């Protein structure tokens, strides 16, 4: 996974300490050419949301030519699981679950628990696909997904296979 050392590379990562040195080594990217956007789960939940906006600004203002969406292998957001168990949240979650299940446009189906604790491999694949097919992302920008696996004490990196959906927006946006 050799990256041209003179070009800017954007990493959308999970909020986890210690990923930058691992990614620099794995992608052969120097610190001065590395830009990082951190979010819980390294996910882009909406094609016109704040994280996607930051990605687009990075592409045009920093001349980013390659983007890596980086997740931690099979990690689930433990904080999300804790939120759904709080007694003070139960009424709010019940209301939101109703909205999720009745597919209001701003909610993409499922439950609050599924939304908060989405599988990291699915999240990374969807985010990569959303960036690749976004109308404001130039075709020359390479977008790849990576998983960092910390099993065995030594981190390993695996590339996410390409998703073949070709659809970056939810179905309700296409009708």
Curated annotation (Swiss-Prot):
The family line of this record is: Belongs to the beta-class carbonic anhydrase family.
Q: What is this protein called?
A: Putative carbonic anhydrase-like protein YbcF
GO MF annotations in UniProt: carbonate dehydratase activity; zinc ion binding
The record's section on PANTHER family has: CARBONIC ANHYDRASE, CARBONIC ANHYDRASE-LIKE PROTEIN YBCF-RELATED
């Amino acid at each position: 996974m050799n990256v041209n050392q003179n070009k800017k590379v954007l990493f959308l990562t999970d909020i986890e300490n210690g990923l930058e040195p691992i990614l620099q080594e794995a992608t052969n990217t120097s610190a001065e050419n590395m830009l990082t956007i951190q979010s819980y789960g390294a996910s882009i939940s909406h094609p016109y949301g704040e994280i996607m906006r930051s990605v687009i600004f990075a592409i045009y203002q920093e001349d980013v030519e390659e983007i890596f969406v980086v997740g931690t292998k099979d990690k689930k957001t433990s904080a999300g699981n804790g939120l759904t168990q709080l007694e003070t949240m139960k009424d709010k979650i019940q209301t939101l679950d109703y909205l999720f299940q009745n597919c209001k446009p701003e909610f993409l189906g499922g439950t609050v628990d599924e939304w908060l604790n989405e599988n990291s491999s699915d999240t990374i694949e969807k985010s990569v696909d959303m960036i690749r097919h976004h109308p404001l992302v130039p075709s020359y920008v390479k977008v790849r997904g990576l998983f960092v696996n910390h099993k065995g004490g030594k981190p390993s990196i695996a590339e996410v296979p390409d998703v073949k959906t070709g659809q970056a927006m939810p179905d309700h946006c296409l009708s």
